[in-house]
A protein has these predicted regions:
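Flexible N-terminal pre-Rossmann segment of NAD(P)-dependent oxidoreductases
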Residues: 1-15
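Conserved glycine-rich cofactor-binding loop
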Residues: 13, 20-21, 44
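N-terminal Rossmann-fold NAD(P) dinucleotide-binding loop
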Residues: 24-25
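Conserved glycine-rich Rossmann-like NAD(P)H-binding loop of the short-chain dehydrogenase/reductase
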Residues: 36-51
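The beta1-alpha1 cofactor-binding region of Rossmann-like NAD(H)/NADP(H)-dependent oxidoreductases
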Residues: 45, 66-78, 116
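A glycine-rich helix->loop->beta "capping" turn
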Residues: 58-61, 81-94, 100, 115-118
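Substrate-binding pocket helix/loop in short-chain dehydrogenase/reductase
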Residues: 103-111, 115-120
Length: 129
């Protein structure tokens, strides 16, 4: 196998969580440029649709699904949507992350100042999301 074909992602369906964030949107654009079909998941539908439109304008294939990665039922629903449309998921890129909205983590806090449940939510978002 030639090296240039080893990492060919043409027509591969790649799902990106956190796809409306800074990292996710740039990775989505690059993967689409390389020929992948990009499924962008994120919380901001306006930004998500803008990214999809930019990718499509450049000749790429993309779709957006509004998603909060902390909502497992929504993730399962979106996976069914992706499978119905494309029949496959070839790769998953987890770019979701950050602090939990509403978490009580004051600036300058140490790990010992953070509520245990809030800390678990932040870990879930950044490690599992």
């Amino acid at each position: 196998m030639k090296m240039k074909n080893l990492f060919d992602i043409t027509k591969k369906v790649i799902v990106i969580t956190g796809g409306t964030g800074i990292l996710g949107r740039h990775v989505a654009a690059y993967l689409a440029e390389q020929g992948a079909v990009v499924v962008i998941m994120g919380r901001n539908s306006g930004i998500g649709e803008d990214i999809v439109n930019c990718i499509r304008t450049s000749g790429g294939r993309a779709m957006f699904l509004e998603t909060d990665v902390m909502n497992r039922k929504r993730l399962e629903h979106n996976l069914k949507t992706i499978m119905a449309k494309f029949g496959q998921v070839d790769a998953l890129l987890n770019a979701a992350g950050g602090n939990m909205p509403g978490a009580t983590i004051p600036p300058g806090s140490t790990i010992f100042d953070i509520d245990t449940e809030d800390f678990k939510k932040v870990l879930d978002l950044n490690l599992i999301g």
